[in-house]
Every structure is written in structure tokens, then in C-alpha cells.
């Protein structure tokens, strides 16, 4: 069922942009739209909703670009944690700059960055503020508010949101986005609404969060995959009891939105006389659930994503020495979905290679459903071996033909070990691809193999040991979805990334 389309991209772009327009018109005045998830690179959505492209949200906003201004926010504590966007391999700090650049390249207005939960002893955050200001970006500092989100008298006062710096915007639709979850988007929106009303400007709030999908069942795999993706935040999908009480309709939301709803409703009532929303679901503008074209395809894709998240949590715990809290949470999500790690079809073939050779093994599932494996040899690591074998299969090249001869590999090994000081003579995936590119000038088979690289995108891979940063980066750039068993090839205290 690899790459079966389950989501109607064009229907989504049209329906979603129209619904946002309608919400702004219904509320009147200025609208702060909290944009959950990732705008440009929503890899998670593209994995669990096959057919949803990573740029689907920004393509939708392109329809109303001239009406939109962007606010990017980042949690100052994430700078202290050196938090990384795993799908891109860059820090949240760098991703803020990348987001500003990409927005501007597409013609969006973006002038402000908001640092949330800022404390004066956070030296990394203060240094980042100076960096942003040197780059000509306006910065607003939002503080840690004691009692948030329960002490409403304090929050909706000069001692709460009033302590936050106001980001002065010029357009009536302000999209608030961030590098990842937990960045303080909701608090940023509420703080801005507070300051707008203090200035006599009518302003409202709405939320655009792709997951959980409110009109899918609570334990639909698409919604469970969201829980698996946020095990580090301990988020959970819940029934929106406010919506059930107000309308008698059962919808799904996530725990932090439900917990924050009394604050939002109270804030809007104090500022506007009444709240336009009776539930967290009312706040949302998400149309994704209406654009699923093949439920079975989305279920299967989401189940595979849950398993990938489980392996990811195990690997992260092995790398950092943390306890099993996150993988335990992911295991609970797998149990809710009624699936097991063994249902990731590339896991057992990779382990069988290791059992047979006593060295790391690797396996990939290709678009045609074929499982191709790779073993560790004196010349190649298992990922490199698998990559060459997969390209040969896709290109229809006989398995007996060597795309790279030992004679072409040995000089590279000599360069690595003799001149560059590496202790590992085996070729990594980047070195294999460079060697293959050189060979393609004189070898038609090598060129045929290179031409198949595009057909690896979206394929699943499993390795029996944790990948180093080089192989991890190559697979990411190829669009391959990799998991690993949570062990290193060498049993050492220090493990090079």
C-alpha cells in the first residue's frame, strides 16, 4: 500500500482558504490565526495523509497572501534546550530565520519574531534577540506569567498580558506560526488580542490546527499519530466536552486546547462582552477531515507513522541516556491503534540480515512492494549496500553487476583512513552516491541507477543499528522514512553523530 493517495490536495486548498476568509468576515475587525503544525514543511501531515504535500498549507495561504501578515514565535526555553527540528536537522533558532526567509521569498509580509516564556537569565535567548535585531527583525518579548493559564484575573491585566511587548502589525489577518509545538502560539495570539483591545482595535482569534482532526473519531489512526508525534509534550486527544455540552455533538480536540478554553472564553468575554465560541472546536477552521478521499490509505499511513514514532523515541532515549518515558507513551499509542512494531515490514528483513551475518543489516520497501536488503561488508556499510541494491532493482540491472568496482572504492577508503584520519573504511551513503556519479560519466548502468533516486522518496527503511548523521542526512534529503533499532554498532560511552 506504499504511496496510495488518500487526500485531495486541491479540494483542501480551495475549501480551507475560503473558510478562513469566512471566519474573519464573521468575527469582523482583526483576526489572529494560530497556525498549528508546520507551514512549509509539514512532513507529518504528508506522511499520515498521503496526497497532502509538505507545502499544502502555504499554498493555501498563497490564495489570500495580500491580506496576511506573519508573526513567528519561539519559546525561549527551547533555545536553552537546543531543540532540533528532527525532520530538517536544524535548531529551532535557525529554523526561525529560515521561516522568515522562506515567507519573504514567497511574497508574505513578516517583520516580527516573538520570544515567549522569556526570563532575564536566559542568556541564549537574549543573544538571539540581539542577533535578530542586527538582522533588522523586530522582536517582542513575552514573559512567563505566574498562574497561567488558571489565574484569569492576573492574566487579563497589566500584570499578565500587559507585561508582554506588543507586536505592531499592519494587516487584518495575522498568522501566528512557529518552528514546532509548545512554542507559545496560543498565548501570543491572546496577548496580542488583549493589547489590540487596549488600543481600541476590534480583534479576534481563531485556530488552524491540522491535528487532531476534529471530525474524525478520537482513536482514528490519523489522530493517534498526532499523539505519537507529541510524546515529548505528553499531549493527548480528548473529546471536546464543551462542544458536546453546547451542541450535543461529539468532536475531538487536544488536551491543551480544552484546558486553555476557559481562559480564552473569559478573555473574549471581558474584552468584547461575549465570546463568539462555545467550545475549542468552535475556535478551529480546519477542513482537512473533509478532504480525505481514501480512509483506508490514511489509516495505513498513520499506523506506519505511529510505529516510526515509537522507534524514534527508542533511538532518542538510547542517544541521550533518558528513561523510557517517551517510548512508553508511544507504546501506549500503538496499543490504542491495535498495532505492533513488527507490522513495519522492513524491520524483520533487516534483522534477519544481521542474524545471518552478525553485522548490521538494512532493508527498504520499494514502491512496487519489493523488499531489498543490504549487508555490511569490508567495502560498504549496510545502508550503502542497500542503497545500491535498491537502485539496481529499480533500474532493472542484473544483481550480479557491480555498480562500483572494488578498484574504484579502495582509493576512497585510502583517502578516508590514511589522509583524513577516519577509523571506518566503509563507504557511507554520501560517498557511494558521489562515486556513482563519477562512474556515470563512463558507465551507463551507473547513470541508470542514479536516475532512480527520485523513486526512493516516501519509501520505508529500517536499520539494525542507529545511523550516524551522514547517512541520516542523506536519507532525509532523499525523502526516505528511516527507523533504527535502539543500539549502536559499537558499545562505547561516546558515540559520534
Swiss-Prot record:
Gene3D superfamilies: dip2346 domain like, Domain of unknown function (DUF1846), C-terminal subdomain. It comes from the Bacteria. It comes from Corynebacterium diphtheriae (strain ATCC 700971 / NCTC 13129 / Biotype gravis). Pfam families: DUF1846, DUF1846_C. This is UPF0371 protein DIP2346. Belongs to the UPF0371 family. NCBIfam families: PRK13663.1. The lineage of its organism: Bacteria, Bacillati, Actinomycetota, Actinomycetes, Mycobacteriales.
